[in-house]
């Protein structure tokens, strides 16, 4: 018997995937939402709120750390803990292009799927980017999976036909503890590759290059470009070339040229989506690293009402301090909001949003922002993980958008002005 630990988009996706196959399971969530429990019950699954049964496998949502007491107790009773990527690989024959790295995963995943579709393949993206991988493998000829360290730390036999390793930086130290443990989780993408598989890698990242050169897979190096977008596109082109090589097909320059005209944009990545008077609202919910937040603070129209906070991942605020002259107010929410507030005090106005419920806190933050701005921008660039108050960064972005529209924001993009 399997236990699906954690509902949300990943857990419900797993339950749908299992139902298609007629496979039994129970479910558990330590913060259950009524509508998600209803859906799980409607799919024909029952909860195990006391975690009393013995399970062979536990499919844990990526937001649940492996050292969670429940997972440790279930593992001690003989359960193997895995994630949706492992489950998708085991139960579906669809080949997978797996993409990871500290930065650029989402765009590279979207670009790769787009380029493969331009070559006539039924390619679908999933994983860390919507939808879950288990939701696309049954519909796809090839699945392109964005894989986070949280997902890769719980793979066992998982073997993509093409692996893409973009870079190895510093992130998620709150979860993994050390840079070495974080990198080890990322490198799980490579651990089951064979000479029949392909590995696309960044030739200028020394740690990436060393890992690639130790792999038995066929190597496809790429050189980073002058911008993140160019770098991600180069990686996607090599990933497309590598997968086509497995099929015995060449890269089609005409198909590539056509695809480049319609490249997709990553959601929740510095998206201006609404306006109220002279104030623009920018969703950069995916900006959890210092480098990404710095770029957002540089680009957002000043004065800025900056919404940040959540679960601190060990962020370094020092590079952001010179930009606080552009910030009218910092609105710090979530578990570690007070810690961020203390670090910013005396450099700009800081308001701690104490509400515990994520959506209530987000609405309060937007209200506080609008009370201080007549022009400029309200920027959600959290510099922190979302799991303290939200399902994931997408849920956090949705809460921001709901608050903006509830408080009088009107849909708007730069191209509509």
UniProtKB/Swiss-Prot annotation:
One of its GO terms (biological process) is cell division. InterPro entries: Mur-like_cat_sf, Mur_ligase_C, Mur_ligase_C_dom_sf, Mur_ligase_cen, MurD. It comes from the Bacteria. One of its GO terms (cellular component) is cytoplasm. The keyword ATP-binding applies. GO terms for molecular function: ATP binding; UDP-N-acetylmuramoylalanine-D-glutamate ligase activity. It catalyses: UDP-N-acetyl-alpha-D-muramoyl-L-alanine + D-glutamate + ATP = UDP-N-acetyl-alpha-D-muramoyl-L-alanyl-D-glutamate + ADP + phosphate + H(+). It is found in: Cytoplasm. Its main location: cytoplasm. The keyword Transmembrane does not apply. Pathway: Cell wall biogenesis; peptidoglycan biosynthesis. ATP binds at residues 101-107. Pfam families: Mur_ligase_C, Mur_ligase_M, MurD-like_N. Keywords: ATP-binding, Cell cycle, Cell division, Cell shape, Cell wall biogenesis/degradation, Cytoplasm, Ligase, Nucleotide-binding, Peptidoglycan synthesis. It is an enzyme of class 6 (ligase). Its EC number is 6.3.2.9. Cell wall formation. Catalyzes the addition of glutamate to the nucleotide precursor UDP-N-acetylmuramoyl-L-alanine (UMA). PANTHER family: UDP-N-ACETYLMURAMOYLALANINE--D-GLUTAMATE LIGASE. Belongs to the MurCDEF family. HAMAP family: MurD (MF_00639). This is UDP-N-acetylmuramoylalanine--D-glutamate ligase. It comes from Thermus thermophilus (strain ATCC 27634 / DSM 579 / HB8).
